[in-house]
C-alpha cells in the first residue's frame, strides 16, 4: 500500500490534465456535476449496506473524484484549491475535538458538544439553522429530529 499523499497528488495531477485536455471535463461546472455528486454519494451508501470491500473502495474513489473535480473547477476559477479544502476540514476536525487535540476531557455528550461548536463557528443561533435545503424530505426530517433530541 503506497502512501495516501502520493496517490492524492497523482489524482490532482490527473484531474488537472483532464480539465485541460478532455472537452467533456473542461465543460463541466459545479452545477452540471451535482447529479453525479449525489449519485456517487448514494452509490457509497449502497456499497456500505450491500457491497463488498472492493465495491466500497471503488465507490469511495468515485466520490473522491467528485470532491477533486469540484475543487479543480474552483481552482481554475481562482477561488480555492484542494489544499484549501483539506486544510479547512483538518482544522475543523481539530477545533471540534479538543478532547483529542487539546487538553479537554471527553464529554459525556460528544454529539451535543460537536453541534454547539458547529453553531458557534457558523454564528448560528438555532440548532435548526444550516440544515441542507437539498436533503430529501425524509433525510431533512431525520436531521431536524436528531438536532431536537440533542437539546
Q: How would you label these PLM feature ranges?
A:
Residues 1-59, 65-151:
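Flexible "arm" and connector segments at domain edges
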Amino acid at each position: 500500500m503506497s502512501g495516501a499523499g502520493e496517490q492524492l497528488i497523482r489524482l490532482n495531477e490527473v484531474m488537472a490534465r483532464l480539465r485541460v485536455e478532455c472537452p467533456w471535463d473542461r465543460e463541466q461546472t459545479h452545477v452540471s456535476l451535482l447529479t453525479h455528486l449525489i449519485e456517487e454519494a448514494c452509490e457509497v451508501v449502497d456499497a456500505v449496506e450491500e457491497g463488498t470491500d472492493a465495491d466500497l473502495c471503488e465507490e469511495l474513489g468515485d466520490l473522491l473524484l467528485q470532491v477533486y473535480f469540484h475543487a479543480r473547477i474552483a481552482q481554475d476559477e481562482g477561488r480555492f484549491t484542494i489544499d484549501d479544502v483539506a486544510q479547512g476540514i483538518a482544522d475543523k476536525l481539530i477545533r471540534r475535538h479538543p478532547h483529542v487535540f487539546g487538553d479537554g476531557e471527553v464529554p459525556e455528550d460528544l454529539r451535543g458538544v460537536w453541534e454547539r461548536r458547529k453553531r458557534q463557528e457558523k454564528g448560528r443561533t438555532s440548532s435548526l439553522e444550516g440544515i441542507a435545503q437539498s436533503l430529501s424530505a425524509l433525510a431533512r426530517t431525520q436531521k431536524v429530529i436528531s438536532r431536537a433530541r440533542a437539546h
